[in-house]
């Protein structure tokens, strides 16, 4: 059995199920209508969104707050997708590098274009630190340009690598627990405990990675707004 088979995009009758997997997360965000009192889940979602918006939008200038809707929506999408991927017999779209790059590259490019449109001089000045010696100017400009172009790649690879590593560890320990259950039951109880702790850790990682992804985008936006 190949451990990486779980990361293959599922299909039905030759049709990819990647988009339905993403759209399924929106079901959890639908609020019931015609209710006098708010549902507890609605209250929890509202509190989570308010806290996330406060943390993400704090470093951004007031002029950049108009982009808060897309940042918060992206945070909710990534969080729910990562968490649902930890359930048995589910598919995690965010383990696909192609999808993460498709999200990171356009949003990073938007932050760069916003900076070039609103304050082109300041945006280009980021490529050359103040007080740089004359001989080092070409080298530093090249280094800063490369570091700028690497940002979307780092965003996509970071999210993919962390989620993929967690899923592989869970699968390896699950296989070990299942095999030890018939050969050494006492030892299988120990590995089961490790598996439960790892699952709790992965739930935290799923939330943290979504938050880090959006927070870095907000910092890029703040740098160019």
Curated annotation (Swiss-Prot):
Membrane topology annotation: Multi-pass membrane protein
Alphabetically ordered keywords of this record: ATP synthesis, CF(0), Hydrogen ion transport, Ion transport, Membrane, Mitochondrion, Mitochondrion inner membrane, Transmembrane, Transmembrane helix, Transport
GO molecular function, one term: proton channel activity
InterPro entries to which the protein is assigned, alphabetical: ATP_synth_F0_asu, ATP_synth_F0_asu_AS, ATP_synth_F0_asu_bact/mt, F0_ATP_A_sf
GO terms under biological process: proton motive force-driven ATP synthesis; proton transmembrane transport
UniProt-listed Pfam families: ATP-synt_A
Protein's UniProt keywords contain Plastid: no
UniProt-listed CDD domains: ATP-synt_Fo_a_6
GO cellular component terms given for this protein: mitochondrial inner membrane; proton-transporting ATP synthase complex
Lineage top rank: taxon: Eukaryota
Xref: Gene3D superfamilies: ATP synthase, F0 complex, subunit A
Family affiliation: Belongs to the ATPase A chain family.
Subunit structure, interactors included: Component of the ATP synthase complex composed at least of ATP5F1A/subunit alpha, ATP5F1B/subunit beta, ATP5MC1/subunit c (homooctomer), MT-ATP6/subunit a, MT-ATP8/subunit 8, ATP5ME/subunit e, ATP5MF/subunit f, ATP5MG/subunit g, ATP5MK/subunit k, ATP5MJ/subunit j, ATP5F1C/subunit gamma, ATP5F1D/subunit delta, ATP5F1E/subunit epsilon, ATP5PF/subunit F6, ATP5PB/subunit b, ATP5PD/subunit d, ATP5PO/subunit OSCP.
Protein name stated in the entry: ATP synthase F(0) complex subunit a
Organism: Alligator mississippiensis (American alligator)
Gene: MT-ATP6
